[in-house]
Amino acid sequence: LQVLTEEVGSIDSPVGEHQQPGGESMRLPEHFRFKRXSHLSLCRWCCNCCHNKGXGFCCKF
């Protein structure tokens, strides 16, 4: 269990560093991947129709 925890920590650290400087550009691919793996209705780009703007969810669909 300790080995797995260390590996996950080492993987999370570089990803977190890449997401911070990338900002929104790094978040778009995450929404694409989440849409493919999820059965929820998601937009590729948020239409800003919700109170959670930028959440990726589209209230109209």
Curated annotation (Swiss-Prot):
Propeptide, residue positions: 1-34
Location of region: Disordered: 1-24
Disulphide-bonded residues: C43-C59, C46-C49, C47-X55, C50-C58
Keywords recorded for this protein, A-Z: Antibiotic, Antimicrobial, Cleavage on pair of basic residues, Disulfide bond, Hormone, Secreted
GO biological process: defense response to bacterium; intracellular iron ion homeostasis; negative regulation of cell population proliferation
Subcellular location: Secreted
A single MF term (Gene Ontology): hormone activity
Keyword Secreted: yes
Alphabetical list of InterPro entries matching this protein: Hepcidin (IPR010500)
Record field: transmembrane: none
Gene Ontology CC entries for this record: extracellular region
Role, per record: Seems to act as a signaling molecule involved in the maintenance of iron homeostasis. Seems to be required in conjunction with HFE to regulate both intestinal iron absorption and iron storage in macrophages. May also have antimicrobial activity.
Family statement drawn from the similarity comment of this UniProt entry: Belongs to the hepcidin family.
Identification of the protein by name: Hepcidin
Originating organism: Oncorhynchus mykiss
